[in-house]
Structure formats: C-alpha cells, structure tokens
Amino acid sequence: MADWFSASEHPAALPSQRTWRIVSTVTIALSLWASPSLAKDPFRTASPHAIGDKTEAAFRSIFEQGNYKNAASALSQAESGEPLAFALKASLAYSNWQGESDQSKKQAASDSFKGYATQTRESAEQLLKTDPLRGNLYLAVGNFLEGAYVVSTQGVIRGTPQALGKLQQAFKYLDEAEKIDAKDPELNLLKGYIDLLLAVNVSLPLSSPTQAIERLEKYASPRYLAYRGLALGYRDLNQPDKALQAINQAIAAAPKNPELSYLKAQILVRQGNNKEGIALFEKALSQKDQLPSGIVSQIQRELARTQRRVQNVGR
C-alpha cells in the first residue's frame, strides 16, 4: 500500500501522508485475518477462522500481488458483515480520496472512507460476541480509521483532540485482545506495525520501536508481511542495511508485488545506490495499471527526484 506501509518517504512527511500511513498500516495488519472458511489459517496451525473466499482473494490481491484493481473486484462481492472486508474497502477508498483531483469524486471517496471506517467498527462490535480476540482487534482498527478521517478532514490542529481520543480507544481494545492471547500472530502483526508506525512518525510516548521489532521478528505471521514491516521500520530508523535484508526476504516470499520493488528502491537510494534504485522504481511503475493513482504518483515523483540527483552529480 502507500506511504508508511508501501513506502512514501518518512522524514518530511506531510500530515496527510502520515494519516495514510496509519490507514495503510492498520488495514494491512488487520487484513491478515484473511483465511477463507475452508482454507488453512495463514497464522495458526489449528482452529482457523471462517472469514470468506472473496475477502481472502482481496487480501491476497493487495498484499501478495499489489493488485488493487483485482482486490476491488473481489471486495464488491465480499461477505456481508465481515469487518476485514470493510477495513479493506476503507483502505481503497482512502487511496482514491488522496489520489483524486476532481473535487466531487474526491468528496465521494472521502464519504466512502468514513462510512467503511464506521462499518468496520460496528461489525467488530457484533464479532466481539463470538470471537473476542478478533472483535477487539477490529474495534481497534475501526477507531484508528475514524481518527484518521478526523485528522484528514479537520486538519492536525483542530482534529488532534478527537483523534487522540480515538487512538486511546484503539489501544484499549488492543490491550483487551492481548489479555486473551499475548502471542497471537495476528495481534502481534497488527501491534508490531502500529507501534513501529507511531514510534518513528508520531511524537507520542505510546510505542517502543524495539518492542515493535521484537513482535514482528518473534510472533508475527505471515512472514512476508512481517519482513515488510521490519523493512519499513528499519528504513525509518535509518538502518538501511537491516532494511535491505528484510525487504529481500519479503520479496522472496511475495515476488510479484510492485510495492516491494518500490520499497527496495527507496532503501537502495538511501544507501547511495541510485542506479539500482532507479531500475526498481521503473520496475514498480511497469505494473502501474494495478496500483492506485496516488501510489503511482508517489513512485513517479521519487523516480524523478533520484534521476535529477544522478544528473546533477554527473555535471
């Protein structure tokens, strides 16, 4: 996905970019509950959760293949009342919202995002009755998404008090989930991403990057998403060698995803390897038809900036 998860640069991130990181990270982590009812649970060796084939297809399209268009098609047929499906729809709506220039379409995407965020929370409230762990996790996601909407529409200064309230609620639900099973792979994947996101991007004493990395290394699954989270974290912690090792592991597990090429390109550029970075930016753009326009624009901007840097050095 975009920004923090899929790669927009961290140091000078705009408030809207930070919000997209939160949306992307939350959705990714939660979308990992995407095992269809008759398929193997990607996190557990026993007691798989019944979620649905269409939701599973959407999850794999986004996070294994980086194919958002196929994901949108699957989500149009997704199982009713499934919180994960609503969270994924929210993520796609946010991507359209941020990438749209037509104001009427932009407003429609904003409204869709708000609606799906609310549906994520409300369906999680129902799930809480039968599956407390996942119910609490999705309640956390719903609150995160609703907080992201507030900041995006009201701005950082006006929206922060309400968004902080949503953030506190989200952590309360995550804590409840952790009481049920502190080593649950879904929980640790989600908390690993969120804690790392907040630790490196937001000046709040809510998260520890060390603990987040430990969660991703020890307990999170599936591994290719854990490696991706580690690559993002090490990138933003200015540890490019470790970031490169992690992204290589992610690519080995999910080689068709153009967003992984994009992230590796960023890491290589930070190491000063502009030539290989440019090649990977271009590789990611060769699959631009399956990516949201906002992500494509980000890649194009970073490619152009890197090309200018190379040209200036050669003068």
What function would you assign to each model-found segment?
Residues 2, 24, 28-118, 312-315:
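N-terminal leader/linker segments that initiate helical-solenoid repeat arrays
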Residues 2-4, 40-47, 236-237, 270-315:
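Terminal, low-structured helical/coil segments at or just beyond the last alpha-helical repeat
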Residues 62, 89-133, 138-179, 183, ...:
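Short coil/linker segments at helix-helix boundaries
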Residues 76, 80-83, 129-132, 182, ...:
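Short coil turns that delineate tetratricopeptide repeat
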Residues 79, 168-172, 208-210, 214, ...:
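TPR/TPR-like (Sel1-like) alpha-helical repeat modules
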Residues 87-91, 137-139, 186-190, 224-232, ...:
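Alpha-solenoid helical repeat scaffolds
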Residues 189-249:
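Alpha-helical adaptor scaffolds
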